[in-house]
Amino acid sequence: MLSPKRTRFRKQHRGRMKGISYRGNRICFGRYALQALEPAWITSRQIEAGRRAMTRNVRRGGKIWVRIFPDKPVTVRPTETRMGSGKGSPEYWVAVVKPGRILYEMSGVAENIARKAISIVASKMPIKTQFIISG
């Protein structure tokens, strides 16, 4: 699963997801892509599950690019712990995704295969997405 090798700080504020994505909203590498339509945190497990499903469907010949990276730590407090005594420990990593962001790209396969693979990946994502073609 994806996570940063090292960060300057162990913990982050949650922040808020306002507006749309101005960066990473165009197809750069492949021909087909999966684009987010809603804001969400996408965990490294979800990203990895999508990547595996895509590679399994594309087989050989196709190339895949994962355009998001989980760089935000999410802290969780132990269960049945009283309030106070600091912030919880980092438990997992998420990528902050805004509407318009490209999640995955692929090329080297026919459109019907790409549609099938990307629809399977879309079902693994916690948000509404759309299939787009470059050009």
Swiss-Prot record:
Its main location: plastid. One of its GO terms (cellular component) is chloroplast. GO terms for molecular function: rRNA binding; structural constituent of ribosome. It is found in: Plastid, Chloroplast. InterPro entries: Ribosomal_uL16, Ribosomal_uL16_bact-type, Ribosomal_uL16_CS, Ribosomal_uL16_dom, Ribosomal_uL16_sf. Keywords: Chloroplast, Plastid, Ribonucleoprotein, Ribosomal protein. It holds the Pfam family Ribosomal_L16. GO terms for biological process: mitochondrial translation. NCBIfam families: rplP_bact (TIGR01164). Belongs to the universal ribosomal protein uL16 family. PANTHER family: 50S/60S RIBOSOMAL PROTEIN L16 (PTHR12220), LARGE RIBOSOMAL SUBUNIT PROTEIN UL16M (PTHR12220:SF13). HAMAP family: Ribosomal_uL16. Part of the 50S ribosomal subunit. This is Large ribosomal subunit protein uL16c. It comes from Gossypium barbadense (Sea Island cotton). The gene is rpl16.
